[in-house]
Amino acid sequence: MTYIVSLFLLGLVLGLVAVASNPAPYFAALGLVVAAGVGCGVLVGYGGSFLSLVLFLIYLGGMLVVFAYSAALAAEPFPESWGDRSVLGYVVVYTVGVMLVAGWFWSGWYETSWVVVDEFKEFSVLRGDTSGVALMYSYGGGMLIVCAWVLLLTLFVVLELTRGLSRGALRAV
């Protein structure tokens, strides 16, 4: 299980490097999907199965709509891919930077951070992430509604910002 979690962590770092190094919205959105997927895998490895499911469904269901609109409105005829020279330079710089930072902090966190949830499953009586579901829907119901409204407002703000010189998605007919 430790090898799978470390593979997910490597995929998370590569996905974030793909997001940070690419100026084209198509490939950056693909990097975000990869980073979200393997990030949810890391959460599952550390025992947050419900949290990772909620994160994955909300992220892919809600935020990819915004990415689809942004990519459609900022369409380029020849987008820069990961094989282009400028983007490849950023990929190399970010990867070397991550390796240097990991090498700098290697001895401090390596011994204690690789404990996954399967190694202590004999000691766990309840699931910590599922016990918060009732609180989220009872006491946190108002905040859940506020978050839904904020996501809707974010969608309209992104549509308004990416409309360019045209009249936008909301226009009088």
Swiss-Prot record:
Lipid bilayer topology: Multi-pass membrane protein
Pfam families, per the entry: Oxidored_q3
Alphabetic keyword roster: Electron transport, Membrane, Mitochondrion, NAD, Respiratory chain, Translocase, Transmembrane, Transmembrane helix, Transport, Ubiquinone
Reaction equation(s) it catalyzes: a ubiquinone + NADH + 5 H(+)(in) = a ubiquinol + NAD(+) + 4 H(+)(out)
Record-listed E.C. numbers: 7.1.1.2
MF terms (GO), sorted A to Z: NADH dehydrogenase (ubiquinone) activity
GO cellular component, one term: mitochondrial membrane
Membership in a protein family: Belongs to the complex I subunit 6 family.
Cited PANTHER family: NADH UBIQUINONE OXIDOREDUCTASE SUBUNIT ND6, NADH-UBIQUINONE OXIDOREDUCTASE CHAIN 6
Function text: Core subunit of the mitochondrial membrane respiratory chain NADH dehydrogenase (Complex I) that is believed to belong to the minimal assembly required for catalysis. Complex I functions in the transfer of electrons from NADH to the respiratory chain. The immediate electron acceptor for the enzyme is believed to be ubiquinone.
UniProt-recorded name of the protein: NADH-ubiquinone oxidoreductase chain 6
Organism: Salmo salar
Taxonomic path: Eukaryota, Metazoa, Chordata, Craniata, Vertebrata
